[in-house]
A protein has these predicted regions:
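Absolute protein N-terminus
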Residues: 1-2, 101
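Active-site-flanking beta-strand signature of metal-NTP-handling nucleotidyl enzymes
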Residues: 2-10
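Short hydrophobic/aromatic beta-strand micro-patches
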Residues: 10, 54-56
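Short, surface-exposed ligand-recognition loops at beta-strand->loop->(often short) alpha-helix junctions
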Residues: 10-21
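An amphipathic, aromatic/His-enriched active-site/gating alpha helix that lines ligand/cofactor pockets
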Residues: 21-44, 56-93
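Short acidic/glycine-enriched loop/turn segments that link adjacent beta-strands
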Residues: 46-49
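Short, low-order "capping/linker" segments at domain edges
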Residues: 92-101
Length: 101
């Protein structure tokens, strides 16, 4: 069954353009490194400044494989440290949605 991975974060007020640029670079890297197509979405209604990257995979094992590579050091230094000061600490949320139909 297909799964959708959603990582959302709350951008720091006044840092929206820089946070958006950072996420665009991260999405480009995901495509180049893993062939993953990701969407960038903004919350419409609710908490202002919440933004999310969304990917779809065939199964959770693919998400875990990518996660392990990233944790293992695959993320370039500019992406590993580039988010500092752009997002509110403690406000990043990961969700995995299972497609049932």
């Amino acid at each position: 069954m297909a799964v959708t991975f959603v990582r959302s974060a709350l951008m720091v007020p006044g840092k929206f353009p820089q946070a958006h640029e950072y996420l665009e670079k991260r999405i480009k890297w995901l495509k180049e490194k893993f062939g993953v197509e990701a969407s960038l979405m903004a919350l419409l209604g609710g908490q202002v400044g919440r933004i999310a990257t969304v990917t779809e995979q065939d199964d959770v094992a693919q998400i875990e494989k990518i996660r392990r590579e990233i944790v293992g050091g695959a993320l370039p230094k500019e992406l590993a440290t580039g988010a500092e000061g752009l997002f509110v600490p403690g406000e990043t949320k990961d969700r995995i949605w299972l497609k049932i139909r």
